[in-house]
Design a protein with these regions (language model features):
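Extracytosolic ligand-binding ectodomains
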Residues: 1-128
């Protein structure tokens, strides 16, 4: 049995963090920094060296937005928006996978990160 819950449960003042781990809760979140990931660790080290402080969520988001859109524009030019669904990307803080509801609608990022609270070692892992 898997227990899935909204990502808001992580921020409830009344929720017991131990319960999330004991139940091996699964949740989907739009953003998550995996500090065990070497790429995330390198970003944090470089950010600390440059700004002498810890990166906040906006630093990771800014990195990911620039990395995604600049790389797409460099490879496809302005036409990258014609086939944005063909280029999903996993980055430091978030993933990008654009979809359209129909041909006349704009693109929406439908990517999430699925997290699992591991009761064995009290870690949070990103799953595919």
């Amino acid at each position: 049995m898997q227990v899935w819950c909204t990502n808001r449960v992580r921020n409830y003042e009344t929720s017991d963090p131990d319960a999330l781990f004991n139940l091996s809760v699964h949740t989907s979140v739009p953003y998550f920094v995996d500090y065990a990931n070497p790429d995330d660790q390198q970003f944090v080290r470089q950010y600390r060296a440059l700004y002498h402080t810890e990166p906040e969520d906006f630093a990771f988001q800014g990195h990911d937005v620039i990395a995604y859109f600049v790389s797409r524009m460099m490879q496809q030019g302005s036409a990258f928006t014609d086939q944005a669904d063909l280029y999903p990307m996993q980055l430091l803080h978030c993933n990008f996978h654009f979809k359209r509801d129909n041909e006349k609608s704009g693109w929406r990022n439908r990517a999430t990160r699925n997290l699992v609270y591991d009761k064995e070692d009290f870690s949070i892992a990103i799953t595919k």
